[in-house]
């Protein structure tokens, strides 16, 4: 493993101290906000660097004690144990510093647009899509995020043919960005009389929420259609033309929202969804051309990739990208154990990024 960039680390520590002094002198307005944000960004890595330097000083002292205790077996044993402990701590802190120095995904702190669509499997696929959507909304509730449904198309027996929702909360994208892909379920459907296990699938897409400045949309490039909202069976459920469909002509991207009775609110939601999709398309194109980033991905990043299987008869969940199996299906589907899959995925992603940085 390559040595840490000590000169850069010293610069970060010095900059952190400089900002702290400026804040204590009473910076105001936008300057205060800017400095406060930079101070918060630097604090984690600076704390790790200081802890690392403290551990290195402690190791020097432990090595000196070890050298002086050659004639005292008991003291030597204690010194050897302390040296080993400090070496392990230094290695862990050095890894933490390297991780803190990795380039951050600018979208990580944002909320998300969550899209869940039933795949192969008919009614059972729609029911499973509903299970996945509820799993994510329960997880969002645990994290203190709010959920706003943008559009939905219910299945004939329940669940969803498609549902799109915004999950508003800091860090939602960082936690859920690796949920994109094909999720497969194996279980006996409620309508199955012979007890046979069926396999169905649903596709999940996680997009970072887009801000106005992220995507430049020319009004002339949009075709906006309004129509009467329809229910699950195709019947009209609204006497006014409140549903909105927006087509971005240059990319032929189409979004439609009909959940609100207000055409104005539906249009605002549709524009938010359109911005997110256009931003995501642009990010996908950029990432496809970056070999180092491809190496740093968990899985292929392709939304047609099968990423996870939920086997109900065995109570098993398997994430195929990292060969992780948990026998906690009920807890995962309830959202309470989803972090036990997400955390290893993030760890694997960080390890891949570190390896790519080492090779660069």
Curated annotation (Swiss-Prot):
Keyword Cytoplasm assigned: yes
A single cellular component GO annotation: cytoplasm
Compositional bias per record (Basic and acidic residues), positions renumbered to this chain: 284-308
Single GO MF descriptor: translation release factor activity, codon specific
Gene3D superfamilies: 3.30.160.20, 3.30.70.1660, 6.10.140.1950
Protein location: Cytoplasm
Keyword DNA-binding attributed: no
Region (Disordered), start-end ranges: 284-310
Purpose of the protein: Peptide chain release factor 1 directs the termination of translation in response to the peptide chain termination codons UAG and UAA.
Protein's name in the database: Peptide chain release factor 1
